[in-house]
Amino acid sequence: MISSNEFKTGLTIEVDNDVYTIIEFQHVKPGKGAAFVRTKLKNVKTGGITERKFNAGEKVPKAHVERREMQYLYKDGDHFVAMDNETYEQTSLTEAQIGDGVKYLKENMNLGILFFNGTVIGVDLPNTVILEVAHTEPGVRGDTATGGSKPATLETGAVVQVPFFVNEGEKLIIDTRTGNYVQRA
């Protein structure tokens, strides 16, 4: 059990038989009445976001989420197969479990898989990945004066905005959290 006074962003709790991750929280002390904690919670199974108030000091069960390092192996139809780095056990993941990270999956990439009661509830990708540019329009001399950008299709099929000087075949570092170009690799 954890007190609502100890809430912090990223903490995983159980509320109404569901598992939630705290996205935002705020301690509120009104002029009249008891203090409370206003939270924004994300359901780890459905991805839905809900707001909820907890009384100050209210005890809430902490969800014991296990994080295992796994390696992404290959795509099999609608499923993505990952292997546990310690036990070599394979786990099948759906696109919904991976979320937007599907665009950046590359074979042999290490992932953090989150389990709750033996069920996959989420996937943590590395913060950055190195991907090759599969297609982009060639930059024209003088384009860089404005510091603009152009779309580039990466080897995984993801489309990102890149500076004009980036050409096909170059390897780029991409931030998986925002989907933005960081720099050349």
From Swiss-Prot:
Q: What pairs make up the disulfide bonds? A: none
Task: Give the residue range of the signal peptide.
Answer: none
What GO terms are given for molecular function?
translation elongation factor activity
Does the keyword rRNA-binding feature in the UniProt annotation?
no
One cellular component term (GO) for this entry is:
cytoplasm
SMART domains linked to this entry: EFP, Elong-fact-P_C
Keywords attached to this entry: Cytoplasm, Elongation factor, Protein biosynthesis
Is the keyword Electron transport in the record? no
Q: Which GO terms describe its biological process?
A: peptide biosynthetic process
Highest taxon of the source? Bacteria
Q: Which family does it belong to?
A: Belongs to the elongation factor P family.
Name of this protein: Elongation factor P
Organism whose genome encodes this protein: Desulfitobacterium hafniense (strain Y51)
